[in-house]
From Swiss-Prot:
Species whose genome carries this gene: Calycanthus floridus var. glaucus
Subcellular location: Plastid, Chloroplast thylakoid membrane
Keywords linked to the UniProt accession: ATP synthesis, CF(1), Chloroplast, Hydrogen ion transport, Ion transport, Membrane, Plastid, Thylakoid, Transport
Keyword Chloroplast annotated: yes
Gene that this sequence comes from: atpE
Cellular component, GO, one term: proton-transporting ATP synthase complex
Signal sequence bounds: none
SUPFAM superfamilies: Epsilon subunit of F1F0-ATP synthase N-terminal domain
Annotated disulfide bonds: none
Family membership noted in the UniProt record: Belongs to the ATPase epsilon chain family.
Database matches in NCBIfam families: ATP_synt_epsi (TIGR01216)
Subunit structure: F-type ATPases have 2 components, CF(1) - the catalytic core - and CF(0) - the membrane proton channel. CF(1) has five subunits: alpha(3), beta(3), gamma(1), delta(1), epsilon(1). CF(0) has three main subunits: a, b and c.
CDD domains in the record: F1-ATPase_delta
Pfam family for this entry, one: ATP-synt_DE_N
Protein name stated in the entry: ATP synthase epsilon chain, chloroplastic
């Protein structure tokens, strides 16, 4: 038995295919979804979406949004998403270093919040590449 997974951003469809299982980062922690999962709607946090198909795991960096799960259908609408295999490791590492530097230079509450958010996004992209 499989799940139909659709990952969407405002600009494009990132993934639309059958999968065996997913592990999704939500605002209240990670959840695993197998076929016949109870219906839920949940907020998606910045983090890694793990997708299992044919015994292998695919990693995807997702940048927050919403998910609806029910009747073996999963629809995930996120601000942005990238497959780990599509991320340039050197560019991701540079972005992480810039985000860390910007956080250390941030002044005021708003700049600190924005810098922390940019750092979380950058770490997620690096993690999507390096996760085994």
């Amino acid at each position: 038995m499989t799940l139909n997974l659709c990952v969407l951003t405002p600009n494009r469809i990132i993934w639309d295919s059958e999968v065996k299982e997913i592990i999704l980062s939500t605002n209240s922690g990670q959840i695993g979804v197998l076929p016949n999962h109870a219906p839920i709607a949940t907020a998606v946090d910045i983090g890694i979406l793990r997708i299992r198909l044919n015994g292998q795991w695919l990693m995807m960096a997702v940048m927050g949004g919403f998910a609806r799960i029910g009747n073996n259908e999963i629809t995930i609408l996120v601000n942005d998403a990238e497959k780990g295999s599509d991320i340039d490791p050197q560019e991701a590492q540079r972005t992480l270093e810039i985000a860390e530097a910007n956080l250390s230079k941030a002044e005021g509450k708003r700049q600190v919040i924005e810098a922390n958010l940019a750092l979380r996004r950058a770490r997620t992209r690096v993690e999507a590449i390096n996760v085994i």
